[in-house]
Amino acid sequence: MSKGIHWVRNDQRLSDNPALSKALSECEEVLLVYAFDDRIWQPGRIGPYRAKFILQSLDSLRQGVESLGGVLTFVHGRASGEIPQLMRSWGAERCYGQREDAWEETEEEKALGREVDLRLTEGKGLLEEEDLPFSLADMPGVFSPFRRKVEKNLTIRPELP
């Protein structure tokens, strides 16, 4: 039986979540994991309003996961240190997550990817590169021509389960 871990980060949705959908389609069992990274969760680094918002979002996600019979697991520390240990103890073969763009997040992806089979997906934007009717090199430099080309050729992707 194949097992995988879905690394919960900034995309805390159960529906229309490309990384979670990929994990569920490739694994028979998926454990959702959120890492409270001490480098981020410290005074002065994260404000009280942002912290409250994230905690409320995680609680909502936890309730949604539990309503489906699953578990949202929380670990304390860097994902690159905690997730490999959890994968070994649970017998998971792969880790899935959404690709991030910020420097610290991409460094953490690289560190985790050196330890486990990490499969990252896009999914933060309304459009992905392959949806564009032109290459990035040929992208219009002004919004109006961009919008006209995209609107003329746009096929809206169906929502993921």
Please place each PLM-identified region on the residue numbering.
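Trp/Phe/Arg-rich N-terminal binding region typifying the photolyase-homology
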Residues: 1-158
